[in-house]
């Protein structure tokens, strides 16, 4: 698991572990509450700070993640480089608070509201070299209500996101270093 912030999605993933998946390590790009949540759950943690050499940071990140079958970017706010993506190709997934390919990037909820769409949602997708451009694994829609602002809509999307990521992880299978998900 990769985290950068509060770790609320991470906590949901930890709380819903069963025989289908286990969180074995949490790696962050800075000290953050997500690391504390993992430590409280008895999960191995590591912080890999981004220095001036981004290529070295990616190598250090690969070493920190180790032998994980699946890497989940759960609120991780850094772009993963070629070294990392090559090491975990086809096995790194991300959640996004919009129905991709619409509204990629860090402000998906705000952008959906500004555009005036009536429906947005949550997407789980594979991570590739682009920003939120990887192959879509699963999506779930959330209707935008007249009284929604960015915060209220984001909370409703997070609720759906938490269910969706657990569904995806429970359906995940790794075969020949490739992540297969049958939902």
Question: Across the structure, where does each feature detected by a protein language model lie?
Answer:
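One-carbon transfer enzymes
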Residues: 1-183
């Amino acid at each position: 698991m990769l985290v950068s912030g509060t770790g609320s999605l991470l906590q949901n993933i930890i709380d819903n572990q069963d025989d289908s998946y286990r969180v074995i390590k949490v790696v962050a790009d800075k000290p953050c509450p997500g690391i504390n949540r993992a430590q409280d759950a008895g999960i191995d943690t590591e912080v890999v700070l981004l220095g001036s050499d981004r290529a070295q940071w990616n190598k250090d990140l690969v070493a920190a993640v180790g032998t994980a079958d699946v890497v989940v970017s759960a609120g991780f706010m850094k772009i993963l480089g070629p070294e990392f993506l090559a090491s975990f190709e086809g096995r790194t997934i991300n959640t996004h608070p919009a129905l991709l390919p619409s509204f990629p990037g860090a402000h998906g909820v705000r952008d959906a509201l500004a555009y005036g769409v009536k429906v947005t949602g949550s997407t789980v997708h594979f991570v590739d070299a682009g920003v939120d451009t990887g192959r879509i694994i699963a999506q779930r829609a959330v209707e935008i209500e007249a009284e929604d602002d960015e915060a209220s809509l984001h909370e409703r999307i997070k609720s759906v996101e938490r269910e969706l990521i657990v569904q995806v992880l429970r359906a995940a299978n790794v075969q020949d270093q490739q992540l297969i998900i049958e939902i």
